[in-house]
Amino acid sequence: MTVNALLLSSSRVGDTPYLSHAIPFIKPLTTNAQKWIFIPYAGVSMSYDTYLASVVAGLSELRLDISGIHQHPDPRQAIKDADGILIGGGNTFHLLHELYKYDLVHLIREEVMNGKPYIGWSAGSNVSGLSIRTTNDMPIIEPPSFTALNIVPFQLNPHYSNYRAPGHNGETRAQRLLEFTRVDPITPVVGIVEGSALWRQGETLSLLGDNPAYLFCGEQQEIPIPVGSDLSHLLK
């Protein structure tokens, strides 16, 4: 079995309906996977039931059987029984805290590396990398470790944008990622713009969508990655 993981930057593009832009990206992963488990742990400002309902509605045209992990008495068994794993956005620190709390980090990695499809967006993409050290989120809770799922062996920065509002004096996203590369100059960071996604199929990694991504690594800063690029070298 080979890895089949889709890492979406966001759940929306502009004013589009929830997850609608991602349907063409998601559909190929559902060909042989009907029963999906949704992990809503990043959703801090809403109930898990509300979050689940929005995902079910957003993906309704795919006619999938989606349940929330919070509905199952044994979260680990729920992961094992599912055909595929969905992890939504929200607060990455809270998400990873709960994954460690229920002893799911190593299990999810094992299942995905053995071929179980994985779809994450925003925080769900953040945790697919080596660690969550390049998330945009506020550290509202402290997980036991920043080490994440390592489905891809580099860092991700979803919702990437280097826009600076006029008159704003805070750091840009590029400046924040530069700080990371000063501390860890050998680990690549891929910034994925809203509407874009990374798709890992075995030892192949490609960029989907209509916008470039951006690479940060050591002295290389904000290097554009053209749409459709083969990024398989980042898996080495």
From Swiss-Prot:
Subcellular location: Cytoplasm
InterPro entries attached to this UniProt entry: Class_I_gatase-like, Peptidase_S51, Peptidase_S51_dipeptidase-E
Role this protein plays: Hydrolyzes dipeptides containing N-terminal aspartate residues. May play a role in allowing the cell to use peptide aspartate to spare carbon otherwise required for the synthesis of the aspartate family of amino acids.
Gene that produces this protein: pepE
Keyword Cytoplasm assigned: yes
Signal peptide: none
SUPFAM superfamilies: Class I glutamine amidotransferase-like
UniProt catalytic activity: Dipeptidase E catalyzes the hydrolysis of dipeptides Asp-|-Xaa. It does not act on peptides with N-terminal Glu, Asn or Gln, nor does it cleave isoaspartyl peptides
Name used for this protein in its record: Peptidase E
